[in-house]
Regions:
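Short beta-strand/loop segment that forms part of the nucleotide-sugar
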Residues: 35-46, 70-71
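Hydrophobic helical membrane-anchoring modules
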Residues: 1-5, 179-255
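A conserved acidic beta->alpha catalytic loop
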Residues: 43-52, 100
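N-proximal low-complexity "stem/linker" segments adjacent to membrane-targeting elements
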Residues: 1-28, 35
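Acceptor/aglycone-binding surface of glycosyltransferases and processive sugar-polymer synthases
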Residues: 66, 70-87, 92, 104-189, ...
Length: 255
């Protein structure tokens, strides 16, 4: 077992207005915990001050916690998350969005599940106890329609596949993310790249026979979100179809 308990992976693209507060909130929370931790910031080729802010944060917290910054070319969130997860050193790895839509305090719901033997703990904006705060109705409706299609085509057991707050045991994270087929090449993209990679992550977990727990969490809609509900929904649906086709071709079969 690793001496480091928790790795927090934070992908960030052009987040200069939100990243400093997010990182300070995460670090302040973790400093109050009895376990060892690290924060892994993956700068997704930002054009603003995001990368510099992350580097400054790492220097400021030197000696108080392990802070690492990875500078990627702009290849999209999926590639950034995969980079961070595969380089995480903790026994458990949790990734979250740079806007901290799910408060860091919600991690206390995920870690006990991982400690009790679950391989993956999935934050969910649906189910008893979940809270979706400030979300426009049309966004919620589109999300529900998308998830119904996901349940029909790929993974039928989850009420919410897209919440950006997911935790893994280290061995499980390595097994899952090494088997992903979408967005794994360092191909540069333009603009925000919101994809359906969460669906592929959960599908691979299912194919590997891993134990997955879906956990209702608190989630806040953030103004200035980079999600384009129409364009990104179409891309996500395309990704779901690609996952289904990959599955039919046996590309996720355990070896």
């Amino acid at each position: 077992m690793s001496d480091l308990l928790l790795s927090m992976v934070v992908p960030a693209y052009n987040e200069e207005k939100r990243l400093p507060d997010t990182l300070h909130r995460i670090a302040a929370y973790l400093e109050a915990q009895p376990y060892t931790w690290e924060i892994v910031v993956v700068d997704d080729g930002s054009h603003d001050q995001t990368g510099y802010q992350a580097d400054d944060f790492a220097r400021a917290y030197e000696g108080r916690g392990q802070i690492r910054v990875i500078h990627n070319p702009h290849c999209g969130k999926a590639y950034a998350v995969r980079t961070g997860v595969l380089q995480a050193r903790g026994e458990f790895t949790v990734f979250c969005d740079a806007d901290l839509a799910t408060p860091i305090e919600e991690i206390h719901k995920l870690l006990p599940m991982l400690e009790s033997g679950y391989d993956v703990a999935v934050g969910s904006r649906e189910g008893l106890g979940a809270q979706r705060i400030g979300e426009p109705f049309y966004r919620h409706l589109m999300g529900r329609v998308f998830n119904q299609l996901v349940r029909l085509l790929v993974v039928g057991r989850y009420r919410d596949t897209q919440c950006g707050f997911k935790g893994f045991r280290r061995s499980s994270a390595q097994a899952i993310f090494e088997r992903l087929r979408l967005y794994t090449s360092p191909e540069q993209v333009k603009g925000p790249m919101v994809t359906g990679f969460d669906v592929e992550v959960l599908h691979v977990a299912h194919k590997l026979g891993l134990k997955v727990k879906e956990i209702p969490v608190e989630w806040h809609y953030r103004a200035g979100s980079k999600v384009n509900p129409f364009k990104d929904t179409l891309r996500n649906l395309s990704d779901v179809v690609r996952v289904r086709l990959n599955d039919l071709r046996g590309r996720y079969d355990a070896t």
